[in-house]
């Protein structure tokens, strides 16, 4: 599912609209898309890569990429090459991402975000203000240490749920970030939520919920939904 945020950027003779989305080759008939909706950087890997594709038949894009921390700051712990380049029409390129920072926690995943901004070129200067649309795709980047007790595939079933009056608490006792999708409490749909390793999240009991039972799916390393599970107490 895409989450898009828009904000206006005003320059001389230019009003730019910056769109921030997550996508997998989601460029439609003309634009820039990414080859993944999330990345996993396993400890010990020299680098990982992310494909970028320009599906426009005639518009080149300037591509700029960087890695961010969860508090929306640029991370100095990663290098992306090339950090800035022109992606010609109907063309693809690979971004290579390398971790150069200090050792991270060994008992859990760490979360970062990969940001790819695409600015279309303009070949003619029009009179007055022109509208220029840039896209900024932001996807999760998980740094995963070696030697975790079990693989990600076993983690979703380990979630535990507790009823608390008008709340339901979902606990994640695993070393993985787990994104809950198709989440229902008492048969009522609840907004998707990511729960950090060894953390918990309290959901208000939805209006009209028949009980506090919880069903959910999660997102795997490939961005696909896993089979539905019933949360155990």
Regions found by a protein language model. Give the residues of each.
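Beta-sheet-dominated interaction scaffolds and their linkers
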Residues: 26-51, 151-160
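Bacterial N-terminal signal peptides
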Residues: 11-20
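Short beta-strand and strand-turn-strand segments in soluble, beta-rich domains
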Residues: 62-64, 68-83, 178-189
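Intrinsically disordered, low-complexity Pro/Gly/Ser/Thr-rich segments with frequent PxxP/GP/PP motifs
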Residues: 75-104, 187-211
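Asparagine-centered strand-capping/turn motif at beta-strand->loop junctions
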Residues: 52-56, 168-176
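N-terminal secretory signal peptides that target proteins for export/translocation
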Residues: 1-6
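Terminal connector regions
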Residues: 102-154, 159, 211-233
């Amino acid at each position: 599912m895409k989450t898009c945020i828009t904000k206006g950027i005003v320059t001389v003779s230019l009003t730019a609209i910056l769109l921030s989305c997550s996508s997998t080759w989601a460029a439609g008939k003309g634009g820039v898309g990414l080859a993944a909706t999330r990345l996993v950087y396993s400890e010990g890997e020299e680098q990982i890569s992310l494909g970028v594709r320009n599906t426009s038949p005639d518009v080149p894009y300037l591509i700029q990429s960087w890695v961010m921390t969860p508090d929306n700051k640029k991370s100095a712990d990663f290098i992306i090459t090339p950090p800035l380049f022109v992606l010609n029409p109907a063309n693809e390129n690979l971004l290579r991402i390398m971790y150069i920072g200090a050792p991270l926690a060994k008992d859990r995943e760490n979360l970062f975000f990969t940001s790819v901004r695409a600015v279309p070129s303009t070949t003619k200067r029009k009179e007055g203000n022109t509208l220029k649309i840039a896209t900024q795709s932001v996807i999760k980047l998980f740094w995963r240490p070696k030697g975790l007790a079990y693989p990600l595939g076993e983690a979703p079933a380990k979630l535990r749920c507790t009823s608390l009056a008008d709340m339901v608490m979902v606990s994640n006792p695993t070393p993985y970030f787990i994104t809950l999708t198709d989440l229902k409490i008492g048969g009522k749909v609840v907004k998707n939520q990511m729960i950090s390793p060894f953390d918990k999240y309290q959901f208000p009991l939805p209006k009209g919920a028949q009980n506090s039972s919880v069903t959910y799916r999660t997102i795997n390393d490939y961005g696909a939904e896993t089979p539905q599970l019933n949360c155990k107490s």
